[in-house]
Amino acid sequence: MTATVHATQERVIARPDLDQSFAQLRAEVTRPEHGVFGPDSVMWRIVTPIPVVPMMLMEAGLLEAPHPWIAFGTMGSKSSTEFLPRFHRSADAFYDWFCADLDTALRTARRVFGYHSQIQGELPEAIGGYDAGQHYMANQQDVLIWVWATIIKPLKEYYEVFGGRLSSADVDRYYDECRRFALLFGIDRAALPADWDAFVAYFDGVAASPVMDLSEEFLNRPGPLSGDVSGPWR
């Protein structure tokens, strides 16, 4: 799976797609009280060291933010400037997905899906290989795949810093679990890279593509050290 820049509308994840993904999860999970993964999973091992999830959240935010759909979708939103509340909300959601029981994980996923379903608009400028005026929606599958990618790659990398290198067998298991994790977003697993090596090639391709070009609006946003941010940083 290689990075591409699209000039046409991509597949949008709708509520029936999410329902179908949730049905797949319910069919696959044998111990719903243990959630999507369970205590014997590589995922549980990876998220156990305390620094891993917080550091993943920070890196994922930096990797996601330049994408035009995300940069302009958050323009004017409190989430683009009120960093600490957003960080706490994200951490709560991820721990629900990684460690809570299945019903809690699905409920949180549905809430996040509902929030993202409201985010859409037209690009105010040509950027990242997309045309000015092109309609965007936060729940487009190609964007969600990139968001998913920015979560699972830093998780592995930070775990290997704090917990030790994963064996090739564990990497394979981890990626299988990550493909299951994608169902929480309503992503069709057939659209994902087939294995970890293909995933890394996809990730590197997107990271090096025009999609990661930074808009002037994004570059000039206030940051937590700029003195221009309202809310809990002040």
Model-derived features: positions:
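Mature, function-bearing regions of proteins
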Residues: 1-234
